Regions:
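Juxtamembrane intracellular "pre-TM" segments in multi-pass secondary transporters
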Residues: 2-14, 197-227, 413-414
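Symmetry-related core transmembrane helices of the 12-TM Major Facilitator Superfamily/SLC fold
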Residues: 175-192, 382-397
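Paired small-residue
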Residues: 99, 110-118, 303, 314-322
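Cytoplasmic helix-loop-helix junction between adjacent transmembrane helices
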Residues: 115-153, 336-337
Length: 414
């Protein structure tokens, strides 16, 4: 049993590994997103003066982590292929625990930005968990397993800001960072002692120059489609963020409730994703991951149109929740399609590229959303994002159709 599982690429301990990765990703995402509600206050405490400077430094400090993570994600994926993916999780959790604890001890804004960069370089627990689960779970269960993991990641990013609003008044901002470091250290211990990984497959000795991970992919079209779709998903999701609060101001009569309604709007999509991700992942295992990708993109494109014309904040909340339900299966399906179309030995390398593409979308989305909203109006952001999602659905349908036709022709010739 163990031998067969190793040869087929999955691990007989995959359920336990999934549970540890779920708990570890949930806890590390909580710790990583705790700072969102109080980051501007911390920046002000560190010496930033004036509203513009506080906002600017807060944006730089927050974005620094994503920028650094986008640069190194393929590297960590490649090293995971060579030396083991568990080792990458141990490295990430230990490095994040140290850097997060040190963040509570900084004395200047520059030190804060530097540590946020280091967290991005050293971190990547949730992305590493995605790679480990994708590569060591039976392929026929990968959609469900990745859906469960995605729910944990999304739940952590949803709970984190809520706790971040509660803890600083009770224990202080600096102590909150130290507590975050302690939580991540617990994830480090669980990862070290509980995760069991198949050893990396031995490499055949050859005098020929080894091919890069990308060169070893027999059919690159599905992988390119999923890299593009992952970037599009992150871009579309984040493009709305800069305008939500201002948009809600136009919808809510009682201006004292603007921040509350805006917070619910931002959380509604995440809640929908949590509820649907494992179910859609399981559905994709039955009906095909491509079908769920195309359907999710098409439904989200349709749901974005009425968001541009709502007249009440609760209408926007309902539509964002439905959109979260539709998008819940996208990330698990993207990872599963890539997993099904690459050799086992390059999984970390290619999935690292996928994670980098998503980080690019996370950085570019808010920039584009803010620019379009400022120059063409907020409705244009929703409508423009709808067009992008529709184009993504059409693109994936074309790639899927051509690939299916090509496979039929190959089967007929053989």
């Amino acid at each position: 049993m163990a031998e067969n599982s190793t040869q087929s690429g999955y691990n007989i301990h995959w359920r336990r590994n999934l549970a540890v990765c779920f708990a570890g990703s949930f806890s590390t995402l909580i710790a990583m997103t705790l700072l969102l509600p109080f980051l501007p206050l911390y920046v002000e405490q560190l010496g930033a003066k004036g509203h513009a400077a506080i906002v600017q430094w807060s944006g730089v400090a927050y974005g620094a982590t994503f920028f650094a993570a986008a640069l190194v994600a393929p590297l960590w994926g490649r090293l995971g292929d060579l030396y083991g993916r568990k080792l990458m999780l141990v490295r990430a959790s230990f490095g994040m625990a140290i850097c997060m604890s040190l963040t509570g001890m900084v004395e200047s804004v520059w030190q804060l930005v530097l540590l946020r960069l280091l967290i991005g370089f050293a971190g990547g627990y949730s992305s590493g968990s995605t790679i480990l689960v994708a590569m060591q779970t039976p392929k026929e269960r990968s959609g469900w397993a990745l859906g469960v993991l995605s729910a944990g990641i999304t739940a952590g990013s949803l709970v984190g800001p809520l706790l971040g609003g509660m803890l600083p008044p009770l224990i202080g901002i600096r102590a909150t960072f130290l507590l975050s470091g302690a939580v991540i250290f617990l994830a480090f211990l669980a990862t070290t002692f509980l995760i069991k990984e198949n050893p990396p497959a031995p490499k055949a000795v050859s005098s020929a120059k080894p091919k890069s991970g990308w060169a070893q992919i027999p059919d690159k079209r599905p992988v390119v489609a999923m890299l593009t779709t992952g970037m599009l998903l992150a871009f579309a999701t984040m493009s709305i963020e800069p305008i939500i609060t201002v948009y809600v101001q136009q919808l809510v009569a009682d201006q004292s409730k603007v921040t509350m309604v805006a917070g619910v709007v931002m959380s509604a999509a995440a809640l929908g994703t949590i509820l649907s991700s494992s179910w859609l992942g399981k559905l994709a295992d039955r009906v095909g991951h491509w079908n769920v990708v195309v359907g999710a993109l098409a439904v989200s494109a349709l749901l974005l149109v009425p968001q541009a014309f709502v007249t009440d904040g609760w209408q926007l909340i309902g539509l964002r929740f439905l959109m979260g339900l539709a998008l819940g299966g996208l990330l698990p399906c993207i990872t599963s399609v890539i997993r099904h179309n690459i050799p086992d030995g390059v999984g970390g390398n290619v999935l690292g590229l996928s994670i980098s593409a998503q980080y690019v979308g996370q950085v570019a989305g808010p920039l584009a959303g803010g620019f379009v909203g400022g120059h063409f109006g907020m409705r244009a952001v929703f409508l423009g994002t709808s067009v992008l999602m529709a184009l993504g659905a059409v693109y994936n349908w074309i790639v899927q159709t051509r690939r299916a036709r090509h496979m039929l022709l190959e089967a007929g010739e053989s």
